[in-house]
Amino acid sequence: MPTRTSLSTLAGTYPILGRPLPAVLSTVLPDGRLQSTIVWFACDRQHLLVSTMREFAKARNLRLCPAATLLVVNPDDTTDWVELRANVSLEEEGAQDLLDDIGHRYTGLRPYFGQVVPADLAATEHPVTCRLTPVAITTPPPVPPLDRPAVLSTSHTQPPPPRLPTPVGCGQDADLPADHLDLLDAPLAGALATRLPGGFPQTQPVWYAREGSDILVNTTLQRRKGRNLLADPRATLLIVDPVDSSRWIEIRADVDLSTIDAEQQLNALTRAYTRHTHYYGEIYPLDQRNLETRIIARLHPRAVHCDAIHR
């Protein structure tokens, strides 16, 4: 399981938060789906600060459901990441100054209106600060050594795996834009957002593969995202161009879960993303396959959004 750390160590424990890296902010839409977008952020003692505009969807989402998840991934090592689930307050006082500070942090330019984006946008866009107060911090779990003593399966003492949901069937798929298929066909780290039982988004890096108009992600029934999808088979996948963070594709999807050929698909992802050919035995200990049930999460796109408003 991912590890959770005391909030008192937030500033000093996570050097990644001190870097001007694009982050993924996931918020809850009125229909219960999740919106994931790229944001710039800053740290303020025990808070994270994100600047957006009063008119933007994420601000509207947060007015209705003031909970969000921020994911920051090290672009040099995608196994190094921090996920922060937070309660959010929206503040307009001082929002313009913070917007200028964050814009300068990421671009070296100020003011935001006039240097980062055209000055005339100030007439129609009104800054608001999203103050995130973390309630949970998650980091990657340590990978067990390949030569660890064999762990015996305890499946005989556990209830059988839950029955997988009935496939969602043939809904109205959203088209995947041809000019963004390069992001879907490259071995990049995607950010998969699912709903936790309490309503918070869970957003963590995943491997993925495109199969026609569907996107395939591999997980297990025992992991949190697998349990989330059993309870609510909807997810949002965000993939960002590593060269230009204003270019991205966000896919809101219905999800089918299947155990059929799940380990074979996992090995295909392993070959695409690493120098290895098999996940179990080369990345994770071989006996781990006896401790978990692999599933393919097939994402059927229902809505697709691309690119930042200002590029």
Residue ranges and their predicted role:
Residues 13, 58, 95-98, 180, ...:
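Amphipathic alpha-helical interface surfaces
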